[in-house]
Amino acid sequence: MTDEGAEARPEALTTPNLLLAALPEAEWALIRPHLQRVPLRRKQVLEEPRTEIQHVYFIERGLASVQARTQADGAHGVGLVGRFGMTGLGILLGTRRATLRVSVQVPGSALRLGAEEAARLMEASATLRRTGLSYIQALMTQSAQLSLCNARHPMKHRVRRWLLLARDWLGEDEVCVSHQLIADLLGVRRASVSEQIECLESEGIVSQRRACITLRDRAALEADCCECHRLVRAEYRRLNLLGAERAAERAAEDR
């Protein structure tokens, strides 16, 4: 089934998704014909617990959250997926069943790959499989570090860390989310998030308009943040995704 608004496969497909951009040429040529660019809508659910995974999404623009949920507590964010990553990780582990909810928080676009095709390609290419498994390790590191941060670090650092990671994953300084969404994903009260962001605004580190936060001084935001953001970035650097990021930025400047 094709998503409404899906675009036709271009003959020469390039992508800002850094996981795909970091692939060797042979593996990119292997996977490229099977990818289809589709829009991502806000609140679109890409995976639901205890249901079969239908597609793998390589996010190009936008932001999705990985959430654990209970009936009593609702959703709690355990990870973010943006231009550095992909969904459908169960397929890499030999299962088609989702265990966590993945939903779009900032709309954008993705390259979509059918689940059966993804499984076949991972089986055919050891390099694709290793890349996917390395990404799973990076996402596990992110989830573990976020759990530690949410449990042990003050609200000031948690909000700063969330904004920095969201900015990295989006690739732009404007993070169009509400205070309520950040609060929901952090598992805290909205007022606590609003207080911290208003402090940042008063210091000139961020500016705000309705449901959008713009990072004005990233260096200042990083200077008074816990080390969790740096540790998560270090794991993605190990995958050479930050090298792909710099190459993409240089290519954009040359155009």
Residue ranges and their predicted role:
Residues 63, 108-110, 212:
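Structural motif
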Residues 164-255:
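Phosphate-/nucleic-acid-contacting segments
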Residues 44-106:
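Cyclic nucleotide-binding regulatory domains
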Residues 1-41, 86, 91-93:
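Cyclic nucleotide-binding regulatory module and flanking cytosolic helices
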Residues 23, 59, 81-82, 105, ...:
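A conserved hydrophobic position in a structured secondary element of the catalytic/binding core
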Residues 105-107, 122-190:
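Polybasic "coupling" helices that flank or enter modular domains
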Residues 79-137, 141, 145:
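Cyclic-nucleotide recognition modules
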